[in-house]
A protein has these predicted regions:
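Basic, Lys/Arg- and aromatic-enriched nucleic-acid-binding interface segment
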Residues: 2-53, 57
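Short, leucine-enriched amphipathic alpha-helices that occur as contiguous helical runs
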Residues: 20, 35-39, 131, 135, ...
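Conserved tyrosine-mediated DNA breakage-rejoining catalytic core shared by Y-recombinases
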Residues: 2, 58-99
Length: 172
């Protein structure tokens, strides 16, 4: 098994199956609409092969092929094109958002429709603002379900990696 430097520096902040189940139960009973949306983004990132938060926030409808059940996107950090198979849970989340965001450029309402992805400074600011907002909300959820660490979008990425490794998949 080969891990990238990012996974090699793993800090242990991944969710167990039980913690993921508790998070899903919290989601089902959550009445705060924005927090519920952030949880949907967390679950989408997890089910989309641990997609980075910056790629969740910059995900556009043109990147989604519902017929092939895949996501095709040039990742922001690596500038490499990836094809990610979309699981049924990921597709379900996308269907919900498609109903809410019809006619919008971006899948999730984390950045302005006018954001220029080639403007590095604007992208940096948008990413930091969105990440801070999401992670503050997720941290509250993590506390409420008794996690021993602060829940964040990055925990979705780590959790996917741990689940995949436990199923014998390679992270290279």
């Amino acid at each position: 098994v080969s891990l990238s430097e990012e996974e090699a520096e793993f800090d242990g902040k991944s969710l167990s199956r039980e913690q993921m189940a508790a998070l899903l139960e919290y989601y089902k009973t959550c009445t705060e609409s924005r927090r519920k949306e952030f949880l949907e983004m967390f679950f989408f990132a997890f089910h989309a092969c641990g997609l980075r938060v910056v790629d969740v926030m910059t995900l556009q409808w043109k990147h989604i092929d519902f017929a092939r059940k895949e996501l095709r996107k040039i990742m922001i950090k690596t500038n490499k094109r990836h094809v990610i198979p979309l699981t049924e849970p990921a597709l379900h989340i996308l269907q919900q958002w498609r109903e809410k965001r019809e006619g919008c450029r971006y899948v999730f309402n984390l950045v302005k429709e006018t954001l220029d992805l080639d403007d590095a400074e604007a992208l940096y600011k948008a990413r930091n603002n969105a990440t801070k907002c999401i992670n503050q909300s997720l941290a509250v959820v993590g506390e409420q379900i008794g996690l021993p660490f602060s829940l964040s979008m990055h925990a979705a990425r780590h959790s996917f990696a741990v689940f995949a490794l436990n199923k014998g998949l390679s992270m290279s």
